[in-house]
Regions:
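C-terminal beta-signal and adjacent terminal beta-strands/loops
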Residues: 630-632, 705-708, 712, 716-734, ...
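N-terminal plug
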Residues: 36-44, 51-101, 116-125, 140-147, ...
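Short loop/turn motifs that connect adjacent beta-strands in outer-membrane beta-barrel proteins
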Residues: 160-163, 190-193, 302-307, 374-380, ...
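A beta-strand signature from Gram-negative outer-membrane beta-barrel systems
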Residues: 116, 125-169, 209, 718-719, ...
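Short strand-turn segments of transmembrane beta-barrel domains in outer membranes
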Residues: 134, 152, 161-188, 277-287
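Outer-membrane beta-barrel domain signature, especially the mid-to-C-terminal portions
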Residues: 563-566, 570-580, 589, 593-597, ...
Length: 903
């Protein structure tokens, strides 16, 4: 007689669908904890006499035959050292991120295999409340009525869990200059029929100015504290008499400091030498910010198969930025009794009064969400609703009002060199911008099995939704008020289907493996854009239980976001910018806001995937993906102003009579076509440190990674109740298994992306931008050919160490090739964060000496531990002033110390 436990785990993929479980399984928003006798393990005696154990999926698993990209059990989760599900999602970013190339949005999040109103419902839950995490490829999103453009994360909760935790964090950079403090308190209760979570966060960060990073100010401006004189005479001469005293033609001279009536002789001492125009102490690299956020979720079972959940969130964020000093130029007449020059000159200077130019912003965000789940026979009906309101008010200080001061200088009644010159200045009326963005969304999905084929169940999902978007904005600038009011109603419908063609245990499937196809079609009717179509089809082949191939094609039509059309127009002065045409760095005005002339986008993608979990390597999974993206009329933020971009968008750029850059209109634009191809491959591997956990050890310690759903059963025979054991960090102790010890684990996720093609055609008739060979659309240069993502670490006897980072290869941005223009080269960068944490519960001597430390954790986080910042050089090897490392990454290496206590 032979027992095949490995086969038992693999057979979990054919278990009863999670949506059709009996009443007691899905009676709450949380998963009922399962003891050994709750996991059915029917023993069958086949004709060969072999005992076959048929293991079922863990309750709350996703009902799909598509194998997960990654699975994390309780030991894996504990080894990450996360404080919330937000931290946990960040820790598994390499596995959860999609390589489809359609942005870096959050993955789709499920709770116990079901839709929720949004990630807000779960993000503040403590990781100790999670029994298992499953990460699925993009095609599983179709099952839940989503587009297949993001991966899916399913969180399976424990039952009868309760905790109250507080956490304090303090962070500051190695180079000093600013600090961040954050306090968070979280209350969580998960019972037999209810789930409640309340989280309060308060965060404050001080400002960081340019002077605190020793940045060199860009030249070219005569403005300075104290002032500089420039000539208006022949050849720019200030005064023939001054030139005689200085012994050369004088066209510029710094105003002698601390002298109210400087003489020509004193000006001769500053001839052709300017006062320093650095005002870095009045310009911020990072604003002062404050944030208060409250997030709460309540869920209750209304019946055996009916669950209602409600979520509410409020966030208040304020920021203050410094934009420089008031400054202008005056004509000082030669007839002025305070001028020693005898002819007209120009005085250019900054003023410390009234105060630095500022931008103040305050944002109020209120969001609510609800989810209703109900089982209708064999069909799962889910209704989600969301309302979000974001109100923003921005106040930007304009320059001072120099009218009276200028008139007094011209009349000769005001001494422009006096110490109190400009002491009574007042600001002009500030620029004001306010916007209210509201979004109402209701969506209904119905998923189930309409029929069963010999190869398996046909699964279908029907989805319908309604969205109303409202944007009201008002701007007031230079006495002119501009109002924008946009409304958009979206009605959408879609249907998704997955059909098994062959089953491994039926007919020809035993020879050729499992084959299945899926398809989806949907349309959206936008009140301001008309109808938009989306479609997709996919093929899945599993020649072996541990090897899967997938191919899919997706297409959709997309409208610009309502904010991209109607955001208020803002003008930000004194923005550090590099001008490729002249090869210089300077401060200019930048216009941002919405562009009502944008048009819709059409996209089509081809995706090929392969997943392999070899039998001969435990807890190892290898993945390979190929992506090809084609887009027409893409909406993009305004790209980096290279000569190619300036030629295509000449009307967006303003230069003065000398060709110096004055301003850029950076409101969104449409590109005619974008094409990209990339290969992404990677591996997930994990294991235990030391001997395997014996029977009766911590729950879930032997879960498989990357295998089929249900491969990680809840606890070993004779062991504790999986996920049970009362309150605390799971099990019978605070930080893990009975006695307070968690299994020792290590894990590595490593992914490499190789970009084959990244091209943009701005409009027909202009050259194609090749982002891999010298073209650029962002201030970070072109597209990196290579990108590597790493997430890994170990956890042993209460101590944890994690490394998480990204490597990107260098890029270039070509200039015009004409004299004065420069190419820029951007270096490789390896941004690595390190985490070291200790669970004090597992340090018996420490807890005995200080009982308060029971249930606590101390974490040291080092952001950018290598202090690696992109090094930008022109073709002569010089660093452009606008690309000084303080501008690129003003934070640098940051140390953060946190203390978390669970009560």
């Amino acid at each position: 007689m032979k027992l095949s436990s490995f086969s038992a785990l693999l057979l979990a993929s054919t278990a009863v669908p999670a949506m059709a479980l009996d009443d007691e399984v899905q009676s709450t928003g949380s998963t009922v904890a399962i003891s050994n006798d709750e996991i059915e393990e029917p023993v069958e005696d086949d004709s060969s006499g072999e005992i076959v154990v048929t293991a079922q999926r863990i309750r709350g698993s996703v009902d799909t035959d598509v194998p997960p990209v990654e699975e994390l059990n309780e030991a894996d989760i504990a080894s990450l050292g996360a404080s919330s599900l937000t931290d946990l999602v960040a820790a598994v970013a390499p596995q959860a991120n999609s390589g489809r190339g359609r942005g870096g949005g959050q993955p789709i999040v499920l709770l116990n295999g079901q839709r929720i109103s949004g990630f807000r419902e779960l993000r503040d839950l403590p990781p100790e409340a999670i029994r298992q995490v499953q990460i699925f490829p993009e095609e599983v999103a179709l099952k839940y009525g989503f587009r297949p453009d993001q991966r899916v994360i399913n969180f399976i909760l424990k039952d009868n869990f309760a905790s109250f935790s507080t956490e304090f964090e303090h962070a500051q950079p190695e180079d000093g200059g600013f600090a961040t403090n954050e306090f968070e308190a979280t209350l969580t209760r998960i019972g037999a029929s209810t789930r409640f979570n309340l989280d309060v966060e308060l965060e404050r960060s001080t400002a960081l100015t340019e002077s605190e990073r020793d940045l060199i100010s860009s030249g070219g401006s005569l403005l300075a504290r104290g002032g500089n004189i420039s000539g208006l005479g022949t050849n720019g001469e200030i005064s023939p008499a001054l030139s005689v005293l200085a012994g050369s033609n004088v066209t510029e001279a710094g105003v002698p400091l601390g002298i109210s009536n400087p003489s020509l002789l004193q000006f001769a001492g500053t001839a052709n030498r300017l006062n320093d125009g650095d005002i870095g102490d009045a310009r911020t690299l990072l604003p002062k910010t404050e944030r208060l956020e409250v997030n709460g979720t309540w869920s209750r079972s209304l019946g055996p198969q009916t669950v209602l959940s409600l979520n509410a969130n409020y966030a208040l964020t304020g920021s203050e930025s410094l934009l420089g000093l008031p400054g202008t130029s005056f004509v000082v007449p030669g007839t002025s009794p305070f001028s020693p020059f005898g002819q007209d000159v120009t005085l250019s200077r900054y003023f410390d009064t009234p105060r630095p130019l500022e931008r103040e912003s305050e944002t109020h965000v209120f969001q609510t969400g609800s989810t209703f789940n109900h089982l209708l026979g064999g069909w799962r009906w889910t209704v989600t609703g969301n309302y979000a309101r974001t109100a923003n008010d921005t106040r930007t200080t304009r320059n001072a009002d120099f009218m009276a001061l200028r008139a007094g200088v011209l009349a000769g009644t005001i001494n422009s060199f006096a110490a109190d010159f400009g002491a009574n200045l007042l600001f002009q009326a500030p620029d004001l911008a306010s916007s209210v963005n509201q979004n109402i969304d209701v969506r209904s999905t119905l998923a189930g099995t309409p029929l069963t084929l010999p190869a398996g169940d046909v699964q279908m999902t029907f989805a319908s939704g309604f969205t109303r978007q409202m944007l009201d904005s008002e701007t007031w600038r230079s006495g002119v008020t501009t109002d924008v009011s946009l409304r958009r109603n979206i009605l959408n419908h879609s249907v998704n289907a997955e059909l098994p063609l062959t089953g491994r245990d039926f007919g020809i499937g035993s020879t050729i493996g499992e084959w299945s196809v899926n398809g989806n079609i949907g349309y959206s009717d936008l009140s301001d854009f008309g109808k938009l179509l989306e479609y997709g089809a996919g093929l899945r082949w599993a020649p072996a239980r541990n090897l899967t191939f997938q191919a899919s094609i997706t297409g959709d039509e997309n409208a610009p976001a309502i904010g991209q059309l109607g955001n208020p127009t803002l003008v930000t002065p004194n923005v550090a910018t590099y001008d490729f045409t002249r090869g210089e760095s300077l401060f200019i005005n930048v216009v941002t806001g919405g562009n009502p002339a944008l048009i819709g986008e059409k996209r089509r993608d081809v995706i090929l995937n392969a997943n392999w979990s070899p039998d001969f390597i435990k807890d190892f999974a290898l993945q390979f993906s190929y992506f090809k993206n084609n887009s027409r009329n893409t909406t993009s933020s305004f790209p980096l102003l290279t000569p190619e971009i300036e030629a295509a968008f000449a009307s967006r750029v303003v230069r003065d009579v000398d060709g110096r850059l004055v301003s850029i209109d950076q409101r969104p634009v449409n590109f005619d076509r974008e094409t990209s191809q990339r290969i992404r491959w990677g591996l997930n591997v994990s294991g235990n440190i030391g001997a395997e956990t014996p029977a009766g050890g911590p729950p879930g310690a032997t879960g498989a990674r990357g295998g089929p759903p249900g491969a990680a059963a809840g606890g070993s025979p004779g062991g504790p109740r999986a996920g049970g054991g009362g309150r605390g960090f799971g099990g019978g102790g605070r930080f893990g298994a009975p006695g307070g010890g968690q299994p020792s684990r290590w894990n590595i996720a490593l992914y490499h992306t190789y970009r084959i093609q990244e091209e943009i055609l701005i409009r027909p008739g202009v050259p194609v931008l090749d982002l891999l060979n010298g073209s650029a659309t962002s201030s970070n240069g072109g597209a990196s050919r290579h990108e590597v993502e790493l997430s890994g670490g170990m956890f042993h006897k209460g101590f944890g160490l994690r490394l998480q980072g990204t490597y990107k290869s260098g890029t270039t941005a070509n200039g015009t090739g004409l004299p004065g223009s420069n190419d820029l080269r951007f270096s490789d960068i390896a941004a690595v964060n390190a985490f070291l944490f200790v669970n004090l519960d597992q340090q018996a001597k420490v807890v005995k000496a200080v009982p308060f430390l029971k249930g606590s954790r101390v974490t040291l986080r080092v952001e950018n531990i290598l202090n690696d910042i992109v090094d930008v050089r022109d073709q002569n090897g010089n660093v452009p002033l606008g690309y000084q490392q303080g501008y690129i990454d003003p934070r640098g290496r940051v140390f953060e110390l946190s203390f978390r206590k669970r009560f």
